[in-house]
Regions:
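Charged, low-complexity intrinsically disordered segments
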Residues: 1-169
Length: 169
C-alpha cells in the first residue's frame, strides 16, 4: 500500500486540522481499565494517581485541557516515570480500537512519519523547534503498525514488524 495514495504526505508534523484526531486532546470516548473518559488525555492524566475514586471524580467528564491542568497538580504515583510511556501506549491503542472511524483514519496515514509538533516546548512527547523525542508520534506509528497487522493490511512488510510485547498480554 503506497502511503502517498492515502495522505499524499510522507511526514505529518502536527496534529491539527485534518490530523487533529491524532492528538490526545481530540474529543472521543476512551474506556481504560474499566473507566470511560471523554478523551485520551483525561485517561492518561488519571493514571498519574492510583486511587480509582480520584480517577473517576477528577478525570471523567472533563475536557482534555482541564485534565491536563489537574494532572499537573496531583500527587504523582511513585512509579510514574517508569510507567508513563506504557500507559500512553495502552491508552492510544484503546482509543483507536474503540473508535473504528478513527482507526481507519490512522491507518489511512499509511507509512507517514507522525510527529507531535508543538510550540509549547514539549520535547518528550513531541518535537518543538526541531528538537524532541516525539514519544507520542512514535507510539502512534507503533499502534498503526500493530493495528494494520491485526487487520491484515500491512503497511510495512510483515517480517519488518517487531513484536510489541505489551500488546499481546
Amino acid at each position: 500500500m503506497d502511503q502517498t495514495t492515502l495522505t499524499g504526505k510522507s511526514v505529518i508534523d502536527s496534529f491539527e486540522g485534518e490530523y487533529e484526531f491524532l492528538s490526545n486532546f481530540y474529543n472521543c470516548p476512551v474506556t481504560y481499565k474499566g473507566i470511560t473518559y471523554n478523551n485520551s488525555e483525561a485517561a492518561f492524566q488519571a493514571q498519574k494517581v492510583t486511587d480509582v475514586y480520584t480517577q473517576v471524580r477528577d478525570f471523567t467528564g472533563v475536557t482534555a485541557s482541564v485534565a491536563k491542568k489537574l494532572g499537573r497538580h496531583c500527587s504523582l504515583r511513585p512509579d510514574w516515570n517508569d510507567i508513563r510511556v506504557d500507559e500512553m501506549r495502552a491508552i492510544v491503542l484503546q482509543k483507536f480500537l474503540q473508535n473504528p472511524r478513527l482507526e481507519k483514519r490512522l491507518l489511512d496515514t499509511g507509512t507517514a512519519t507522525l510527529i507531535e509538533g508543538n510550540w509549547w516546548n514539549d520535547k518528550f512527547w513531541g518535537v518543538c523547534k526541531g528538537e524532541g523525542c516525539n514519544m507520542l508520534g512514535l507510539i502512534l506509528m507503533e499502534v498503526r503498525d500493530y493495528i494494520s497487522k491485526l487487520r491484515g493490511a500491512y503497511l510495512t512488510s510483515p517480517e519488518k514488524l517487531e513484536p510489541i510485547d505489551y500488546l499481546y498480554d
